[in-house]
Structures are given as structure tokens and as C-alpha cells.
């Protein structure tokens, strides 16, 4: 598991990871957790690497993982849907800044891979939804 420090703590706390509120409390107790932060690089295979972008807003621990032109955003950015910031540790200003960070890191060849819905070209995103909030 590669995650932020906030997420490491949340994995073992069923209230912080919100599973308690869904009626299925889950607390991860494994030890194979790697804490990553902005600009960390995760070596993969065949010289491929994943670069970390800290993208808080949906929650304090959100990260985006960049692999070449693919951006795995999880809940930090779901294309063309406003970012949910009303949950524990959500922050509207950070969400706006994170959306702008993702936008600036992408180009016309970039693909956004969100945690929900389908992949989409970054050029098909209405960035004003996030930037002008």
C-alpha cells in the first residue's frame, strides 16, 4: 500500500475511514504500508515510474499517482463533478488548489483515471467547475 500519512492513520480507524458509518467497520492492521508525499517516485517495472502529487481537498490524505500520461486521481478529482469536501477532513480551498495542480500537470495527451466513473482525456474536463468554485 502506498498512501499519505493521514491515510495510513485512517486505514486503522474505522471512524476516520468512514466504514463505521456504512455499517461495515473495517480497520486495516497490516504493516506493508509505504508513506509517500509530493514528488516521491515509486519505481515500477521496465524503467517505468509513478510520481506522487499531493491533492488534498476531498480529504486531507488524497493523492494523485501519475504514470506517464495517466493520472490516477481517486476521489481527488472525478471529471466534471464537483469535489465532495463535506466529509471529515474535506477542505474546499484545498480541493480547488488540487484541481488546479492536476490541470497544470496535464496536457492534451493526458488521461484522468478517477476513482469513480470512466477515464477521460484531460481536454474533455470542464476545469471551471473546480477552479471557479
Place the predicted regions along the sequence by residue.
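Metallo-beta-lactamase
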Residues: 17-20, 49, 54, 59-132
Amino acid at each position: 500500500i502506498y498512501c499519505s500519512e493521514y491515510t495510513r492513520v485512517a486505514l486503522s480507524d474505522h471512524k476516520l475511514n468512514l466504514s463505521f458509518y456504512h455499517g461495515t467497520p473495517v480497520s486495516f492492521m497490516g504493516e506493508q504500508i509505504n508513506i509517500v508525499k509530493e514528488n516521491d517516485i515509486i519505481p515500477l517495472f521496465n524503467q517505468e515510474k509513478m510520481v506522487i502529487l499531493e491533492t488534498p481537498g476531498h480529504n486531507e490524505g488524497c493523492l494523485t499517482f501519475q504514470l506517464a500520461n495517466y493520472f490516477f486521481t481517486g476521489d481527488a478529482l472525478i471529471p466534471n463533478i464537483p469535489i465532495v469536501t463535506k466529509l471529515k477532513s474535506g477542505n474546499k480551498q484545498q480541493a480547488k488548489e488540487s484541481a488546479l495542480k492536476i490541470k497544470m500537470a496535464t496536457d492534451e495527451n493526458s488521461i484522468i483515471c478517477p476513482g469513480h466513473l470512466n477515464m477521460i482525456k484531460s481536454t474533455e474536463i470542464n476545469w471551471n467547475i473546480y477552479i471557479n468554485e
